[in-house]
Amino acid sequence: MIFTRTNALKGEITVPGDKSISHRSIMFGALAEGTTRVTNFLRGADCLSTIDCFRNLGIDIEDLDSEILIHGKGLHGLTAPSSMLDVGNSGTTTRLISGILAGQRFTTELNGDESIQSRPMKRIMEPLTLMGADITSIRDNGCAPLRIHGQKLHGIAYTSKVASAQVKSCILLAGLYADGTTSVTEPYLSRNHTEIMLTHFGADITSKGTTATVTPGKDLHAQEIIVPGDISSAAYFIAAALMVPDSEILIKNVGINPTRNGLLRVCQDMGADITLLNENYGNGEPTADLLVRHSELHGVTVCGSVIPTLIDELPVVAALACFARGTTVIRDAQELKVKESNRIDVMVNNLRAMGAHIEGTDDGMIIEGGYPLHGAIIDSHLDHRIAMTFAITALASDGKTSIKGADCVKISYPGFYEDLTRLAK
């Protein structure tokens, strides 16, 4: 797919529903008593993998176009699957469902695509094993495919080495099936959608600082969920408006959960003109409309506790830094190496191909901004966030940019290119 420089981006857009919340709505709805109704569900490939997995576990899920209905069977209503669960490209599905399956009364095997088969699963296998789970890497390499023999679990107090919502959520979900209380402490607070939504469904979840605790014994009850727009999808339009001169974009109804809104804070630190309008609250999640205008940016240092709040948006930050005056430093972001691709290496190589002055480090990147970018052949490595980042970067660069594997955006944003084209007209 070919992209070229564009004139000002103007208009209003509504981005798809939040991917993290969409995944969890299916999982928690399946474990609840009664029918959970979900509107603005993200029908990206990852979330559809979650639906397929829970259908294979005996849950009736209806897709009525305008809404998703999950006919839950309670915490102990899942049944043994008829075949290996296919998680596709979804790390969220893999890690969260493993916590649920660890406490069932049957054995499950799960696998995914080539990317999933290289992503680290020891980070969930170790705490689940401490809880009494029987979970193994079938190839004995710490990655999928996984085999999980359901067991009687017991609560633990676990200190995680990484600030990962997937690890935390996996342990908390296993904790619903454990004897005694389970707690997870992180080095920094990761996104907290699991804690918010499980509380909404009736679970006994408490949070203090970077520790989340679940006490089992309460049934979950069906809910009505309105999924806010995904700030990770909004990020590309935020960046495009900031990069392309004279642009102004209004992005409607975006989730601005403080554990997810690090991009807004970093962009504003860089000098971005971003205004929050119509701030609201629904299902425990804050939302707002975002009005973004082209801005002159300057370099910043991005590190520490802000990293988990924008881990998926760091490729966008790296691209924005190329258009900012001065130096931008990203550090404490080792997690970028174990995403759908090694996002440090991929961003460095692709931005260099476009003329950027960028160096990779063991835990991030250093970018010298202010040098003009030019078109190049970009390898997305079939990573949706890489493809979308370079699609918008090309709009502010000279010449033609060709993106290999551009259709991988269907993982999280099937209509991305259509929305981008509409704003560029």
Give, region by region, the residue ranges found by the protein language model.
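Structural preference for solvent-exposed beta-strand-turn elements
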Residues: 1-425
